[in-house]
């Protein structure tokens, strides 16, 4: 889709286009087979995830996520991984493994068979569709064919009225920012928008669209009334 910077899209990106009907959104998620939760802020989301959704979980895979860092869940997971008692939750994260001098590929593989997987989503629509772009595929793979319990933490800035506006934001805001925080070598990082590049530095190699919860998996969608990630 060609880049479109009209006024309506700018408003949507700034989150100024509407008041969110969270009750309706949670009901839509429930109808589609998801477990939906509304949290007023990051502190409430962190408490819900760490004290309730991860109860009984002993291992967890984690996808790269600015949202998890910003709401404090990343630090809480590191603390759990560092424990030495029976309550420890072993964390499989490439960031953690790299910092420890371990092979990050092992974290990717173990994350696919962990008790749970946690990340954010690149975008979701008010109709309950989740859209994700990946360069390697570990995150989208784990979300649809990995652990039986999947937890997505979603800030209000990632919720869009429809697929078209979500896709426009992904290609022209999310991907360039992700690349800038990574290698910065992609064409979109340099241009600040999608230029539909076709080379080895392209970061949006894989796109997944999840229209409904898979019947053999638990999806826990934590909606936070704050802007998290991009």
Q: Whereabouts are the PLM-identified features?
A:
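N-proximal short alpha-helices
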Residues: 18-22, 139
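Exposed boundary/loop context
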Residues: 2-8, 121, 130
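N-terminal active-site beta-alpha-beta segment that forms phosphate/nucleotide-binding
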Residues: 21-108, 113-118
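Short, Lys/Arg-enriched N-terminal segments with co-localized hydrophobic residues
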Residues: 3-19
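N-terminal start-of-chain detector that recognizes signal peptides
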Residues: 9-10, 31-34, 88-92, 103-105, ...
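Short, functional N-terminal and low-complexity linear motifs
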Residues: 12-17, 42-43, 132-135
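Conserved phosphate- and dinucleotide-binding cores of soluble alpha/beta proteins
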Residues: 111-230
């Amino acid at each position: 889709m060609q880049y479109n910077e009209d006024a309506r899209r700018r408003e949507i990106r700034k989150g100024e286009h509407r008041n969110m009907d969270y009750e309706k959104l949670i009901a839509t998620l429930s109808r589609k087979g998801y477990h939906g939760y509304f949290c007023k802020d990051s502190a409430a989301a962190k408490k819900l995830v760490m004290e309730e959704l991860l109860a009984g979980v002993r291992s967890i895979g984690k996808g790269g996520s600015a949202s998890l860092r910003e709401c404090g869940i990343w630090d809480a997971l590191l603390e759990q991984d560092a424990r030495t008692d029976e309550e420890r939750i072993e964390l499989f994260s490439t960031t953690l493994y790299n910092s420890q001098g371990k092979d990050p590929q092992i974290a990717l593989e173990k994350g696919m068979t962990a008790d749970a997987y946690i990340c954010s989503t690149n975008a979701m629509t008010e109709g309950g569709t989740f859209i994700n772009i990946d360069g390697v595929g570990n995150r989208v793979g784990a979300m649809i064919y990995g652990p039986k319990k999947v937890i997505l933490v979603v800030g209000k800035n990632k919720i869009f009225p429809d697929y078209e506006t979500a896709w426009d934001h992904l290609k022209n805001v999310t991907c360039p920012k992700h690349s800038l925080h990574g290698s910065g070598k992609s064409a979109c990082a340099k241009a600040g928008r999608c230029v539909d590049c076709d080379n080895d530095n392209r970061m949006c190699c894989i796109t997944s669209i999840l229209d409904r919860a898979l019947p053999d998996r638990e999806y826990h969608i934590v909606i936070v009334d704050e802007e998290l990630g991009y």
